[in-house]
Amino acid sequence: MAKIDIDQIGALIQKQIEDYKADVRLESIGKVLSVADGIATVYGLSQAILGELVELPHDVKGLVFNLEQFHVGIILFGRTDLIKEGDNVRATKKIFEVPVGEDLLGRVVDPLGNPLDLKGTINADAYYPIERPAKDLMHRGFINEPLHTGIKVIDALVPIGKGQRELIIGDRQTGKSTIAIDTIINQRGKNVICVYVAIGQKDSTIANLVKLLQIKDALDYTVIINAGASKEATLLYIAPYTGSSIAEYFMEQGKDVLIIYDDLSKHAVAYRELSLLMKRPSGREAYPGDIFYLHSRLLERAGKLSKEHGGGSITALPIVETQAGDISAYIPTNIISITDGQLYLEQKLFYQGVRPAINAGLSVSRVGGSAQWKAMKQVAGTLRISLANFRELESFAQFGSDLDPSSKRRLDRGRKTVEILKQDVHELIDMPSQIVTFYALENGFMDDLNLKQIRSLMAEIEQGLSLNETGKKLRKELVEHKAIKDKALMELFIDHVRRFI
C-alpha cells in the first residue's frame, strides 16, 4: 500500500485555496405579489429607484413606477401574460435606456427601440436614458433661424423658429396631423432630422404615412416611433420620451431636429390609466396631480443650443385633440402654458372649405417672429390685422346692410386673402413664392382679378421663379438677403407673370 505524503497533500490543498477566486455577486431580487393590466406589484426591492430597469422571466422588462413602504409598482414591457405570482424580479441598477444613432433614420421602431419594419436589426451608436434632464439655461441660444413649413398661413402669420415648441390644437379630423406631416415633407434638402412619435394611432395610418414619406423622398431623414392603438398603456406612456432621447442625440451632434408628438391627449390618457391602476390619488378629470410635470419635463427638452455647445436644436410640434373646440379643458390649457405658441384649427373653418383651417385670431407664435425672414415681415406684417378686420366686416355684411366703397374694397381684399391662404394637402410653397404672392396682394396687383385668376397667378409665380430669368434673379436675391432689396425687380416679375393668366 502506497504511503500517503501528508506534506504533498497539504501543499496541494494550500495551492487550491490560494487559487480560489470568490465570484460573489450581490443582487437585489424581489418577488411578484400580483400582476394585471401590464402592472406588477413586487415585494423585496427595497433599494429600487424610480425609473430603474428591472428584469423578469421570459425576457420581460419592467420600469419602476411607484415606490411604496413595503412594495414597488412596476410597469411591464413584453409578454406580460407570461408573468405570474411568485416570479423573481431582478433589479439592474440601470435607468431605462433606448438605442440612438444614425442607423435609426428611415426606420420604424417601437418605444423600446425594436424595429417594426422588417429591415433588420438596428446598430446603435449609443444608448440614452428615456428620462434626461432638460439642457441648462446657460447652454441655450436665441431662436433666430426659421423652420419653414411650406404652409403659407403658418410661415406668414404664425412663424416657427428652430428650437421652438409650437402646439397644434383642434378637434378631431381638422387637419392637425396633416400640418405636421407636411412640415416633415418640407424639410427635404434642408438638413433637418425629423422624428415622428405616433401615440395611439392605427397601424394602417402609420403604414400609409411610411408610404407617403417614401413617395415624397422624406423617409431617409425621418425616424418613426410607433406606439399603436392596440398596444399597452405602458408603451404609449414611454413613447414620447423615447422620441425625445433620439432627437437629443442628433441635437448634440449639432444638427437641427423636428419632433412631432401625435398626440399628447392620448399620452395623458395612458398616464392616467397607469396612475389609477397604481392607486395614485386622482384630481381634475381623474388625472393624477403630476400630469403637468409629465408634459413640462418632456417639452422642456426641446430648444436651441448655443454655438459654444454645438448649435443644434429640437423644434417640438406637440398635437392635442380638443372636444367640441374647448381649448379651456385641463390638458389643452396645461400644454398651451408650456409651449411657445399654438396653431388653433377650427372645425367651422374646415367645413367652410378654408384649409388648412387655422384660426389666425386664436393662433400665436411667441418667439417665431424673431426668426422670420425680413422679407416676409415686409409683405405680411399687417396681414393678421387685415384678416381680423375682414372677419368682423364679413359678419356685419351678412345683415345685408349697404356698404360704402371703402368697406366693399376691404371685403374684396379679405376674400382674396382667404383664397391665397388656402392650400391643398401636401402642396407646399417655398418662401420666395410666398413672399412674391403676398407682395402682389398687398400692392394691389390682384385687385382686378377674380378668385380663379388669383389661383392661376399663384401657380404662374411659383413656376416663373424657377424658369423665368427675371424670376431666377429675384429668387436668388430673396434667398441671399432674406429681404426685398429691389422692388422694381419684384414688380417687373409680377407684371410679367400677370400676362399669362
From Swiss-Prot:
It is an enzyme of class 7 (translocase). It is a peripheral membrane protein. Its EC number is 7.1.2.2. GO terms for molecular function: ADP binding; ATP binding; proton-transporting ATP synthase activity, rotational mechanism. Pfam families: ATP-synt_ab, ATP-synt_ab_C, ATP-synt_ab_N. ATP binds at G170, D171, R172, Q173, T174, G175, K176, S177. Signal peptide: none annotated. InterPro entries: ATP_synth_asu-like_sf, ATP_synth_asu_C, ATP_synth_asu_C_sf, ATP_synth_F1_a_nt-bd_dom, ATP_synth_F1_asu, ATPase_a/bsu_AS, ATPase_F1/V1/A1_a/bsu_N, ATPase_F1/V1/A1_a/bsu_N_sf. It catalyses: ATP + H2O + 4 H(+)(in) = ADP + phosphate + 5 H(+)(out). GO terms for cellular component: plasma membrane; proton-transporting ATP synthase complex. The record marks S363 as: Required for activity. Keywords: ATP synthesis, ATP-binding, Cell membrane, CF(1), Hydrogen ion transport, Ion transport, Membrane, Nucleotide-binding, Translocase, Transport. HAMAP family: ATP_synth_alpha_bact. Belongs to the ATPase alpha/beta chains family. PANTHER family: ATP SYNTHASE SUBUNIT ALPHA, MITOCHONDRIAL. This is ATP synthase subunit alpha. It comes from Acholeplasma laidlawii (strain PG-8A). The lineage of its organism: Bacteria, Bacillati, Mycoplasmatota, Mollicutes, Acholeplasmatales.
